[in-house]
Amino acid sequence: MRVENNNVSGQNLDPEQIDLIDLLVQLWRGKMTIIISVIVAIVLAIGYLVVAKEKWTSTAIVTQPDVGQIAGYNNAINVIYGSAAPKVSEIQSILIGRFSTTFSALAETLDNQEEPEKLTIEPTVKNQSLPLAVSYVGQSPEAAQKQLAQYIQQVDDQVNDELEKDLKDNIALRMKNLQDSLKTQEVVAQEQKELRIRQIQEALQYANQAQVTKPQIQQTQDVTQDTMFLLGSDALESMVKHEASRPLVFSSTYYQTRQNLLDIESLKVDDLDIHAYRYVMKPTLPIRRDSPKKAITLILAVLLGGMVGAGIVLGRNALRNYNAK
C-alpha cells in the first residue's frame, strides 16, 4: 500500500512545477550563451562609460548685496534724487532682481546654442524669492566650478555696466533739469530787478514833477509804490544807481539748486564698484557625478545581458521543439 501511494504521489506532480524545473534546466544547459551575452553587455556598457560625456553640477547660493557693496551707488542715487531717492532696501531688491533677470537671459541663451549648456537659477526655498541657487553642469568637477564662477562674474559685470550707463543718463537728465531751473530763477530775478528799477524811476519822475527833493517821511518801512516819491528826488536818484549796480537777489532755493548741481557734477560714476549680489555659498566643487552612473550602468548591463541570453536560450529550444514536431 505504501509503494502504491508513493507512485500515485509521484504521478500527481504540479505541471507548473514541472515547467519551472524544465525552464531552469534549459537555462542551466545554455549557461554559456547567457554568460557570453552578459559579457558582451558589460563590454558595451564599459564602452559607453568611456565614450559618454560626464556631467558634474556645481552649485552656488546668492542673495541681495550688502549695504557696503552698494555704498557708492546708493550715495550717487541720493545725490541725484535727494529726498526722492529710494531706500537702501529697495535698491538692494532692485539690484538682485536685475541680477536674476540677466542670469536667466544668459541661461536661455546658452540653452539655445548649437551645443547647449545647462545653467539654471531658482529660489532655494519654495515661495521665497531669496536666496537664489545657481548651478552649472560641466564635464569635470573643476570645469563646472570654474565656469559657474565665470558666468556669475559675467552677469555681475553686465549689471554693473548697465547700472553705470543708467546713472550717466540720469545724471545728464538731472543736470539739464537743474540748469534749466537755475536759468529760470535767474530770469525771474533779473525781471524783478528791472521791475524794481522801473518803480524807483517812476517814483523819481513823480518827485521831480512835485519838486520833492528831500525826504518827506521818517518811517521808510511804511513806503509803498504810491508814496515812494516822498523819499525825494535826491534819494531816489541814489536808489536807481544802487539798484542798477546791485547783483541779482536769489532765494535759498536757487542756492540749493546750485549746490545740487555742483554735487552731481562731482560724481565719478566710472569709479563706482557696484555688485548686484552677495555669495551665501560660493560655487562648489562637485564630488558626485550626475551621469553616467558606473554602478547603475554595469548592473543594468548584467541584467539586460542575462535577459537577452535567457531569451536566446529559450527561443532556440522552443524553435527546436517546434521543428521536432
Swiss-Prot record:
Q: How does it sit in the membrane?
A: Multi-pass membrane protein
Coiled-coil segments: none
**Which superkingdom is the protein from?**
Bacteria
Instruction: Share an example GO biological-process annotation for this protein.
Output: lipopolysaccharide biosynthetic process
Location of this chain's protein in the cell: Cell inner membrane
Give this protein's Gene Ontology molecular function annotations: protein tyrosine kinase activity
Topology Periplasmic: residue spans: 53-294
Asked if the record carries the keyword Membrane, the reply is yes
Keyword Signal part of the UniProt annotation: no
A Pfam family that the UniProt record links to this protein: Wzz
Pathway(s) the chain acts in: Bacterial outer membrane biogenesis; lipopolysaccharide biosynthesis
Q: Which InterPro entries match?
A: Bact_polysacc_biosynth/exp, LPS_length_determ_N_term
Q: Where are its TM segments located? A: 32-52, 295-315
This protein's GO cellular component annotations are: plasma membrane
Function comment:
Confers a modal distribution of chain length on the O-antigen component of lipopolysaccharide (LPS). Gives rise to a reduced number of short chain molecules and increases in numbers of longer molecules, with a modal value of 13 (in strain O111/M92) and of 17 (in strain K12).
NCBIfam families associated with the record? PRK15471.1
UniProt similarity note: Belongs to the WzzB/Cld/Rol family.
The protein in question is named Chain length determinant protein
